């Protein structure tokens, strides 16, 4: 470590004695950018990640709810949409009710996985999501499928999403969108043939309502 010299004067009855003592210098304080730094400079310096978000819903005007959710996601600090898949229609998963609409969005963000997930949950709540019982009909479901190459296994968040590979309504739009974003980071997906077979087995099919393509990012 760097050192500096400090002169210490010691008084004595006979004479003044000057003693030089070397003490370590404190290292300079280096502040790294934080995600909470929402200034243009702070956001530009923060590392960016591609987050993949699955959207689902079967209550109300689902396409309109999706559009609002995408706008809210894009409004998060240091976040913008990279692309959105077509809409897919799916039979309710392990439940009864109206057909689901599903899509997948790719998002570039500086937010860490946990912070990004909490933001998604807040958007769900603002747009009327309720959880009366498992697999209940819903206005909006936002699932974080992957966040860069992050891996997580906590009660709050598992990455990559542990059940995405089982769900045609996730895999079909995810594969479609990822083909348009070849440089984006994502986990390995099943083959096209395997996804098509899963779509047939689970009743997932393309079904974009009028106006959805106009709202596509």
Residue locations for each model-derived region?
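Nucleotide and nucleotide-moiety/phosphate-recognizing core
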Residues: 29, 38-139, 148-149
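Short alpha-helix boundary/capping segments
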Residues: 13-15, 136
């Amino acid at each position: 470590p760097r050192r500096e010299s400090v002169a210490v004067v010691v008084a004595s009855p006979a004479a003044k004695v000057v003693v030089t003592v070397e003490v370590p210098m404190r290292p300079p304080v280096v502040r790294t950018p934080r995600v909470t730094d929402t200034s243009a400079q702070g956001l530009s310096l923060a590392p960016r990640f591609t987050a993949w978000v699955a959207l689902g819903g079967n209550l109300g005007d689902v396409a309109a709810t999706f559009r609002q959710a995408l706008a809210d996601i894009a409004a998060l600090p240091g976040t913008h949409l990279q692309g959105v898949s077509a809409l897919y229609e799916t039979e309710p998963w392990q439940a009864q009710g109206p057909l689901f609409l599903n899509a997948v969005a790719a998002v570039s963000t500086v937010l860490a996985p946990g912070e990004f997930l909490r933001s998604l949950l807040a958007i769900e709540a603002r747009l009327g999501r309720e959880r009366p019982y498992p697999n209940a009909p819903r206005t909006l479901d936002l699932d974080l499928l992957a966040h860069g190459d992050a891996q997580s296994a906590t009660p709050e968040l598992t990455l990559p999403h542990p059940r995405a590979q089982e769900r045609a309504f996730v895999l079909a739009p995810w594969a479609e969108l990822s083909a348009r974003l070849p440089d984006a980071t994502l986990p390995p997906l099943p083959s096209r043939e395997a996804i098509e077979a899963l779509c047939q087995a689970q009743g997932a099919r393309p079904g974009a309502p009028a106006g959805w393509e106009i709202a596509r990012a």
